[in-house]
Regions:
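Conserved acidic catalytic loop of the alpha/beta-hydrolase fold
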Residues: 1
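Catalytic subdomain that performs nucleotidyl-dependent activation
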Residues: 4-13, 18-107, 111, 119, ...
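AMP-forming adenylation/ATP pyrophosphatase catalytic core
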Residues: 42-43, 105-175
Length: 175
């Protein structure tokens, strides 16, 4: 869309309920901390200004201000995982805890802060272990093996080099 329109940024209508659904999808699939940080409010080309607001708040605002609301017809079909979560799971969570969405937003903010902290630590660890010599990157395996728990470090340290499973990297250390 950016290339077609030559716009510098696209604004989406993602809101807090969408973020909760994304979190639950990622949680159900098994994910690391980055998968639990939810939908990013902004990237280089996408901004999500409605992310802090609930679907209910946005609908109320639209109604009060006579703004026409358009709902995607596929949103009602529970054959899609997101919609199943939206219609079957989230209402029960909100019923159990009426402040569930607000609590979730606080939790995601905490997880985002934690993710930043982890990334900074990983970068410092990488600077300590990785040495670039020309086109080659040398790694101190002895120092790498001292990291505990080792498996937590492997994916973030090596994923940008084409490794997608920490077990693959761990296997290299034992060969």
């Amino acid at each position: 869309l950016i290339e077609e329109t030559r716009y510098k940024m696209v604004l989406t209508a993602h809101q807090a309920d969408d973020n909760l659904e994304t979190f639950l999808i990622n949680l159900s699939r098994g994910t690391g901390i980055d998968g639990l940080t939810g939908i990013p409010p902004k990237t280089n080309t996408i901004a999500r200004p409605l992310l802090p607001f609930s679907r209910e708040e946005i609908l109320t605002f639209a109604t009060e201000n006579k703004i026409e609301w358009r709902e995607d017809a596929s949103n009602t079909e529970t054959k899609y995982l997101r919609n199943k979560i939206r219609h079957d799971i989230v209402p029960h969570l909100k019923e159990l805890h009426p402040t569930f969405l607000e609590n979730f937003k606080r939790t995601v903010a905490y997880l985002n802060d934690s993710s930043v902290l982890v990334q900074k630590h990983i970068e410092l660890t990488k600077e300590k272990l990785f040495r670039k010599e020309g086109e080659t990157i040398k790694i101190s395996v002895a120092e790498l093996e001292q990291l505990t728990p080792l498996n937590i470090y492997l994916y973030p340290l090596f994923s940008r080099y084409g490794f997608t499973e920490w077990q693959d990297v761990e296997g290299l250390l034992t060969t």
